[in-house]
């Protein structure tokens, strides 16, 4: 008689597989989802060996625990595949920063505006920072007007998430992309 023993590594979900199941009785379900019945864990393991499958405890908190006959390696592969698909569907929102001085020229302002539009179209938030040097800090109203003008230009691409505010020697504002 050939005994198949698989080397199974327990992943982060801590499944109990084959010999690791120490319960006296288990409720057994076959690979098609049909209930076989309540039996000892040893009998269930023997059935799994006969069918060249693994015995996996899927509901440990039930009384008796529910075990299923399945190819555990294939099951783990499908789980990891589903997790990767879920990660791909999640959109990671980055915050891109654009720095300006309070006395920026019109052409430079346009260049910064174009890069902000690109960031917002990509789905990233834009943090606009105006840095004050020396005596420039006395003219915060100019910087606030500049940020409001910047927000007005970007109105069709994004909304102001955080209004212009002082943070040390910087004035900043955050613009979030519009939902599609």
UniProtKB/Swiss-Prot annotation:
Q: Which gene encodes it?
A: infC
Name the job this protein performs.
IF-3 binds to the 30S ribosomal subunit and shifts the equilibrium between 70S ribosomes and their 50S and 30S subunits in favor of the free subunits, thus enhancing the availability of 30S subunits on which protein synthesis initiation begins.
What's the short name of a Pfam family annotated to this entry? IF3_N
Q: What terms describe the molecular function in GO for this protein? A: ribosome binding; translation initiation factor activity
**Annotated localization:** Cytoplasm
Q: Name one GO biological process term.
A: ribosome disassembly
State the name under which the record lists this protein: Translation initiation factor IF-3
Spell out the InterPro entries in the cross-references.
T_IF-3_C_sf, T_IF-3_N_sf, Translation_initiation_fac3_CS, Translation_initiation_fac_3, Translation_initiation_fac_3_C, Translation_initiation_fac_3_N
Native organism: Caldanaerobacter subterraneus subsp. tengcongensis (strain DSM 15242 / JCM 11007 / NBRC 100824 / MB4)
List the taxonomic lineage.
Answer: Bacteria, Bacillati, Bacillota, Clostridia, Thermoanaerobacterales
Family of this protein: Belongs to the IF-3 family.
Q: Name one GO cellular component term.
A: membrane
